[in-house]
Amino acid sequence: MKRKTFTLTLIAMMLCLPLAAQMSSADMFAHRYGDKWLRLRMHRDHSYTAGVAIKGQSSVGTTQVGDLTALGEQWCLVGTPEAFKMYNRATGKGQALAVSETSEGATATMVKARKATLWTLVDKGGAYAIVPVEGTRLSLNAFGGKGFDLKLYTADDEGGWWSPEAVGRKTVTLSVKVDGKGWEPKPRIAEMNMSVGGMRSSTRITGDLSKQTYYFPEGATRFSLHSITYRGYTFVGFEHGKGNLVASITDAELTDKLHIKAHYAPNDWRTLYYTPDAKGFPYRIPAIATAPNGHIFAISDNRPCYMDIGYGEVDIKCRISTDHGESWSDEFFVADGKGGDTNVMTTGFGDAAIVADSESNRLLVMMVCGRTVCWNGRWTPAKTATDNAVNRVARVYATYNESTRAWEWTEPVEVTNDIYPLFLDAKGQPTVSSLFIGSGKICQSRVVKKGDYYRLYCSVWTRDGGNRVIYSDDFGGSWTVLGTVADRPAPSGDEPKVEELPDGTVVLSSRKGAGRYFNLFTFKDNTFTAGTWGVAASSNDVPDGLSFGANSTNGEIMLVRAIRKADGVKCDLMLQSVPAGNGRRDVAIYYKEMTYNADGTNLYTPITFSQGWAKGIQVSDRGSAYSTMAMQKDGRVGFLYEEEPGGYCIVYAPLTIEEITSGAYAVAP
């Protein structure tokens, strides 16, 4: 297949930088441009360096995250400690650093070398201040960290103290080969972590053609190299010297002008949302659904405020696949938050829960909205549409237009006052003051149909007595509490999900540390209007109960029809996704073969439902968190989850039942 060579784009950072012994001033200076190169590491925070960035028509001195590949972070100091000019490797010998005046706040820029400032070095005992010869009271200062201009400030401030480090002659040049064609034109392929001594530099591999060179500190003799690969690509190995490809390079000898080639191959997983995005914003909170026409919807928060609803602008984005997850549309807004807009409801939208109607090409997306953090919500019947103290709820519909072959989306409509009043007690007093619907998959019944639609079930987080469940028989137009207002199906539950058993019994699965809270609602009769909740079971406290690492994280529960491959018998499998690790990492899918009474009715209690789970596929081998899933029309499970690098990207994985169960089961036809 065709091979492509990709560049290592200059998006990199150095971490954990140990400070070497102070470099003597005599060793820092060159007689002419290019004789000697230095990195100037910020003494107060060694991960930052002094560098040069192009801003408009000017090259400006800036504070940068240290990068072993960056020419703009290498300086040549020509002269003596008492009077020298500062040349930068990226701008060449024709320019040097200057300030237009020696006053506080003056910005350092690159100018013609003959007009550049003469600088002098001031020893600060373990570091140096760099000050203009004409005024030794002010020094070059980092002024706030990454991306901030270098400016003059008092030489007594440690933000203007620098620790020089000589750049050696030994280099490593890295190139990348991808066997085959990826699914998008400019993908992120990997984050390449280079370590030398105690220094680590992470560089992003993207889709531009070229090579990248690493410049190591003087005296470096050993190095390590490791690829953190974005999903959608498989890391094949490093070509290093002679012999077979290797998975990583650890403590290898650093020789002069070493060349390494990294090999990758595309696969059928997809990173749908990269964190950070082009504007530096993160993505979080996945939701996924499959419509009757086979279209798959992958939804995520995009967070310009960098945090949850209540802290500013949050948007909900969507991508659609029409070919079972092979390719995806560009992302678009389902709900566009306005940030500081005067309309409280439109400040932000997030934590989407989605369902595609099983019979019509119609979607419902429920979401939290507004500008209140959930823990601070204070709803009462008297609260108005402009009150900040309410954690609000909104709804969006989408319908497929057969003529245009396009999905038509409504604007978000606030339904706060359709939901909260459901939880008023007999005296008209609120039993819930703050709530949101658990993100991910809204459960649609396979059993209960009243009118045009099969019933929907939504599980609800509240700050008042844990979880509740509500249902709708008109596809989200109106809602009813499942059970009674007094019911507390999971009093200590966090973010919840629901699923339905074949007899109509409703299963609640709620987030908790090291396990799940499980409970079941049993209907009184086949009118499916009244029934009772059991007592919630903490699965990791039950003998043989579902348990995993010490983390508390949102996950998904889903029932699928399967075939037991050992004997070909059809059965139901319950799937539960959650991180398996200690902390938010190693997202996995657990499964449980379901059994029923002879008449097909439920035989489980919350305790027995908690038992008998097996660990299936471990989807992730790194930091990973929230997850959700939906059946696709091709019989695979569309699995959408959060995973490193970059905080959390949103990753789509099409999984077969065989993969999930290590070959024990297959999907039923």
Positions of predicted regions on the chain:
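Bacterial N-terminal signal peptides that target proteins for export
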Residues: M1-T9
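Bacterial N-terminal signal peptides
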Residues: T9-P18
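Lectin-like carbohydrate-binding module/patch detector with strong preference for beta-trefoil
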Residues: Q22-R169
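Conserved "repeat-terminator" motif of extracellular CCP/Sushi domains
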Residues: R169-T171, V176-V178, I228, A247-P266
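A recurrent domain-boundary module in secreted/ectodomain proteins
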Residues: L150-R169, I260-Y264, A653-P669
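Asp-box/BNR beta-propeller blade signature and adjacent active/binding-site loops
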Residues: N267-P669
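Extracellular, modular beta-sheet/disulfide-rich ectodomains of secreted and cell-surface proteins
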Residues: K170-P217, G243-L245
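Surface-exposed interfaces of beta-sheet-rich extracellular modules
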Residues: A220-S248
